Amino acid sequence: MLVGQGAGPLGPAVVTAAVVLLLSGVGPAHGSEDIVVGCGGFVKSDVEINYSLIEIKLYTKHGTLKYQTDCAPNNGYFMIPLYDKGDFILKIEPPLGWSFEPTTVELHVDGVSDICTKGGDINFVFTGFSVNGKVLSKGQPLGPAGVQVSLRNTGTEAKIQSTVTQPGGKFAFFKVLPGDYEILATHPTWALKEASTTVRVTNSNANAASPLIVAGYNVSGSVRSDGEPMKGVKFLLFSSLVTKEDVLGCNVSPVPGFQPQDESLVYLCYTVSREDGSFSFYSLPSGGYTVIPFYRGERITFDVAPSRLDFTVEHDSLKIEPVFHVMGFSVTGRVLNGPEGDGVPEAVVTLNNQIKVKTKADGSFRLENITTGTYTIHAQKEHLYFETVTIKIAPNTPQLADIVATGFSVCGQISIIRFPDTVKQMNKYKVVLSSQDKDKSLVTVETDAHGSFCFKANPGTYKVQVMVPEAETRAGLTLKPQTFPLTVTDRPVMDVAFVQFLASVSGKVSCLDTCGDLLVTLQSLSRQGEKRSLQLSGKVNAMTFTFDNVLPGKYKISIMHEDWCWKNKSLEVEVLEDDVSAVEFRQTGYMLRCSLSHAITLEFYQDGNGRENVGIYNLSKGVNRFCLSKPGVYKVTPRSCHRFEQAFYTYDTSSPSILTLTAIRHHVLGTITTDKMMDVTVTIKSSIDSEPALVLGPLKSVQELRREQQLAEIEARRQEREKNGNEEGEERMTKPPVQEMVDELQGPFSYDFSYWARSGEKITVTPSSKELLFYPPSMEAVVSGESCPGKLIEIHGKAGLFLEGQIHPELEGVEIVISEKGASSPLITVFTDDKGAYSVGPLHSDLEYTVTSQKEGYVLTAVEGTIGDFKAYALAGVSFEIKAEDDQPLPGVLLSLSGGLFRSNLLTQDNGILTFSNLSPGQYYFKPMMKEFRFEPSSQMIEVQEGQNLKITITGYRTAYSCYGTVSSLNGEPEQGVAMEAVGQNDCSIYGEDTVTDEEGKFRLRGLLPGCVYHVQLKAEGNDHIERALPHHRVIEVGNNDIDDVNIIVFRQINQFDLSGNVITSSEYLPTLWVKLYKSENLDNPIQTVSLGQSLFFHFPPLLRDGENYVVLLDSTLPRSQYDYILPQVSFTAVGYHKHITLIFNPTRKLPEQDIAQGSYIALPLTLLVLLAGYNHDKLIPLLLQLTSRLQGVGALGQAASDNSGPEDAKRQAKKQKTRRT
């Protein structure tokens, strides 16, 4: 099948990607030769719509997204590539609210007769837009559900569609064609303020001209007393957001005797409970409300619970819960901080240790639902103390006596910044509170782990003191103040603070010049290990320093600067009760240390002091030290055939350091000799990656330099003669000057160059010239660096051949390929310049070359009578170059190009280029497609003018990856037609891919997303011939690469029985062993025989799973005359799928007992014959020999019979033996 439909022939020079492709179950293991079929069609509409907003998506029948694409904006054409056979669902996904028929199409792609393979169109027809609107609650952005909304043509009464609003008040009508419509809303109970609106539908979804409005919702509730309904209870409604005008069916007059507790509430109206205890507000707009019950008797107002209820009316009717209940009466009281003091806010008042209320900002509180009786009242407030009171409460005592605070907290904090290291740190201290009244006793508390403490104190004057242990005082721990005076009046005292006293030690450093960075240390002499450092830095000759938070004691102060000399490097000070100052360190000189890697000559002098201080030193390798008494900048210049890190080194006494001179480069010389004087350039590349290539030149030959020097000398002598002639007079000038000649430039010419190389560096020297070729083309040299390398490079140059040509007419960018005659690969490829010309060279003049040219969209022919000139003929069309993000050509991309009646779907080949020629003028829409890639641009409309050739570059970015693997049986045979799937896990559970194995058992699961974990497994359907898989699934995590070697073994649902086994024996017996398989009713003829060879394991070809009985017998060729052994055998039934058998073979070598027995039979006769031999030796010796010969013959026959009896005897034995069943 040809994937691609197009109008017009392809030009002769156009490289196209139209190929014949067959749809198969799976693509190759790797590469771009994947099999693709296109599935496309049109989105059609009788009204104008924006096709670019519509997406077409391909799903598996289980709902997994396989591919998605958009439509051509000019005609609605779409194309989707398919890589696998199977069942799919094609869905159109337009903007929300657009309707199409059909919305889905089921596909059964078999590669033969389906609509995609046959190139048919799948069309989706537009049926209408959506109309959207809202029914809102008055003054709210949302509205209710359940309002009936109808759509009808303007000016008619017939309903076209009806619907019900959803939560939030939204409603929508679908499949509405362009036109003018009216929308009406109705509800059986709610009052509608705006019940109708209009809408105009043109070429997109439309919204109602204005929202429909619900005026309000009914709210109801009930009140009871001891389970009976209560009539006449007033329910007052308040709201800070809703006005009285918006409330319907409610009495707006004020309620006599009601005093609101919360002045911020805005009164709206009230309603009264009916005989059944129910009350209701007819119509309340959406918003927040507060309802307060009010029930007044003859002399007292009774409490109703809850006393206040906040509720919110949203977008529906509301029944107030819970039910209101009439309770007892209420009393009030106050909590004060003194007899005539202020109210205490947020105090907790407890009634009989059960009922708890909190005081307001003025200290008042209210107890509700109280009945007559005697109560115990107690108040609580942090840092305040109250006494418990007992009082009798009745309806005639609505106001309680004031509860007055009797004591307050005195709290503070102990802050210790540094604890002495010589004593164990204490977490808690004792603090004493003593009253100025001498009759009162002391109060002692202990701090917590953080140093905080609190006392309870009645009003009065006090002082607080911390008890510090004597050991800590001796170690230097001191707190300030020693005592803290305070006065308690009518509130807690919370600011008592004791802070540790620490001293400071300060001084200055005097330097000969700028001090720079210095380190000053402070070390305790009495407490080992206590040492502190202070880093100083400044560009002045004097600096100060200060050590803060110093405990009392003796200390040693030192200054650290190894490269400077000091009057005193350390001083001792003692800290008592005051800060220590006036510590001074004074610098007296500098020290210079110089480290050399080679024995060299150094020029050493100080800047700014004249040439009299210049010194030249021949120094050897090592470290040299210099003592400097003056500050300043010193300059050190090395002189050597080695180059150092710097041409000269500067030592600044204000920044002392070890001056290290390390040779990093060494002088390498080279010469290039040529037979013609030309431009010669040398490129030197280093083996060191960080070293950039050095280009020298164009170089001047030694002959040129010598000639220039001679000319300069002749000119100098001429000027000298003119000067002398003017001094000696006219007579001398009349003599003709001597004519001086310079040497003629004659070859060979020598070009000298040099390079500074590093130790161990390998350099590659490559000369170049416009007309010369060099032999060798480049040279390598390695520099040791121990001594001056000298001349290491010598190269010779010869003139080369040049090939030039021209494109007619002038055409830029034509690819010119130069090849050696007969060579299979090109030698040089260049492109013509903006004038259509090119030049290639130098080339070896002793070779022959061929020149070819090509350019996409052009036909190029050689100009007769020229070498290298070509004529160019332009072709009209569009050329697409599709590359990956690494700028490499991207093959296998399906490019869809459509416009007017033209449609074409082609695949890119290895060069990533597609060219469409002879296109008609007009607009075209292109879209590249390939699974696992996204493209920029993803699609685009282009305008093709007559005779125009467009070149468009498309870049593909990898967004997903593939999983490659194989499915095989247990014996390694590939399994074809197995349905595989990759199921996303965790956050990727919505993703999945599937495919089918090919004839080699290979599969490729495409489109796996990076960062996702998948289970690769057999699909539940389509694998009826497979019983199970091993493993059940493979877990893969997709990164930024394809995943290979995901292999799965399957077991078929077939009538097959696998038989395998192993033999336990010594490896020396393996070559003698055979495993034979018999049917149990025929042990004479084995049906299969397997030789072990060198393996302990064996495997028979599959048997039928027929339930028959079989016997496995181990046979051996070991001679039984030398070994004793038992041949094991096992019987089994061919039920199930597999049987593994273990056979044990342990032969033992026989001892020579048989030879001894035969010798004993003839020992006695022989002995007698020997005794008689002396008497009748002439008669007995022949007889003895004859007897011995016969006895040996009998023994040999017996042995031969024993050796030949093994296998047959084993069979007979097997028939007689009782077999072991497993």
From Swiss-Prot:
Where in the cell? Endoplasmic reticulum membrane
Q: Which residues lie on this side of the membrane: Extracellular?
A: 32-1155
Q: Where is this region: Disordered?
A: 1198-1222
Which key words tag this protein in UniProt? Endoplasmic reticulum, Glycoprotein, Membrane, Signal, Transmembrane, Transmembrane helix
Q: Which GO terms describe its biological process?
A: determination of left/right asymmetry in lateral mesoderm; multi-pass transmembrane protein insertion into ER membrane; negative regulation of nodal signaling pathway
Signal peptide range: 1-31
Kindly indicate whether the keyword Lipid metabolism belongs to this entry: no
Instruction: Enumerate composition-biased segments (Basic residues).
Output: 1213-1222
Task: Please name the Pfam families in this protein's record.
Answer: CarboxypepD_reg, Ig_NOMO, NOMO1-like_1st, NOMO1-like_2nd, NOMO1-like_9th, NOMO_12th, NOMO_3rd, NOMO_5th
| Superkingdom assignment | Eukaryota
Glycosylation sites per record: N50, N218, N618
Q: Which residues lie on this side of the membrane: Cytoplasmic?
A: 1177-1222
Q: How does it sit in the membrane?
A: Single-pass type I membrane protein
Where would you find the membrane-spanning parts of this chain? 1156-1176
Q: What is its main location?
A: endoplasmic reticulum
For this protein, the record's InterPro entries field holds: Carb-bd-like_fold, CarboxyPept-like_regulatory, Ig-like_fold, NOMO-like_N, NOMO1-3_2nd, NOMO1-like_9th, NOMO_12th, NOMO_3rd
**Cellular component per GO, a single term:** multi-pass translocon complex
Q: Molecular function (GO) terms listed?
A: carbohydrate binding; ribosome binding
Assembly and interaction partners: Component of the back of Sec61 (BOS) complex, composed of NCLN/Nicalin, NOMO (NOMO1, NOMO2 or NOMO3) and TMEM147. The BOS complex is part of the multi-pass translocon (MPT) complex, composed of three subcomplexes, the GEL complex (composed of RAB5IF/OPTI and TMCO1), the BOS complex (composed of NCLN/Nicalin, NOMO and TMEM147) and the PAT complex (composed of WDR83OS/Asterix and CCDC47). The MPT complex associates with the SEC61 complex. Due to the strong similarity between NOMO1, NOMO2 and NOMO3, similar interaction pattern probably occur for the three gene copies.
Q: What is this protein called?
A: BOS complex subunit NOMO3
Originating organism: Homo sapiens (Human)
Q: What gene is this protein a product of?
A: NOMO3
